[in-house]
Amino acid sequence: MTTPAYLLANFGGPRHAKDLQEFLISLLTDRDVTGTFLPRVLHRHLFTFIAKKRVPKVLPQYQSLQNWSPIYFDTETLAKTLSEILRAPVIPFHRYLPSTHEKTLLALRTLHTRHVIGIPLFPHFTYSVTGSIVRFFMKHVPEIPISWIPQFGSDSKFVSLITCHIRDFLQKLGILEKECCFLFSVHGLPVRYISQGDPYSKQCYESFSAITTNFKQSENFLCFQSKFGPGKWLSPSTAQLCQNIDTDKPNVIVVPFGFISDHLETLYEIERDYLPLLRSRGYRALRIPAIYSSPLWVSTLVDIVKENSTVVAEELIKSGKKHTGIR
């Protein structure tokens, strides 16, 4: 059997100020993300305008981070490390950094194999993110049949990794599990996407349930962050929970288990918005770093890649057209 090549797909993030507008326009004009059914041209004009208006608001947030968003650099480094371990090409892809796309597409087109496995760096599948990535490659390289690992949030090795990551964090700080309330935070999604067949929330709950089986002495909540735009989103929101939670546990610890790399949602939103809110209410509030920082992350991902079955692109997205605005 031909040795496969791998496509390591991530969200992308601005590396510096010049990337920010490009990043926001690419993100918000993706109809898989915004879910509108506006005519294509109108959609692009409207959300380009919205993206440009958001730049002055978001720019100071990114500038306050030490090295902007580390997600780009984490993905590049991970691709090189995986390539050495798997002894195969591993091509990185940054969905919302269009200036990097041609390099990825060229690398795919010049491969000496047509056996390509896609690795989306998202534990839980949603048509708005993983689905968007899959459709991108169906459009731009239809001649290359990529099969995908759809999700791994409930994979026993991922569950064990998150469990060890949390326990290591507690041990380093001398905190007992019975003294903790954990807020397991994932990115939010509009409820209408779920009602139209997106499996995201179901997978998040399954993953949360599998992980918290290992934490019976703590108080545990699943919550959803980063709401953008109108309409009802999955609840409880992380912000609401931080504002309203009533627990006798002295330590409230946010666990961003839906995010592989730290980026704006963890380094700014959790760190600068949610933790101060909890502290103002008298709790010791902490954030566990994203799983990328774990020394066991790479070996766990290698096992997941080797042991999980893949799904062809057409099968993966066939029921995902209801909410995306795709015609």
From Swiss-Prot:
Fe cation binds at H187, E265. The keyword Transmembrane does not apply. Its EC number is 4.98.1.1. The keyword Iron-sulfur does not apply. It catalyses: heme b + 2 H(+) = protoporphyrin IX + Fe(2+). One of its GO terms (cellular component) is cytoplasm. Catalyzes the ferrous insertion into protoporphyrin IX. PANTHER family: FERROCHELATASE (PTHR11108), FERROCHELATASE, MITOCHONDRIAL (PTHR11108:SF1). This is Ferrochelatase.
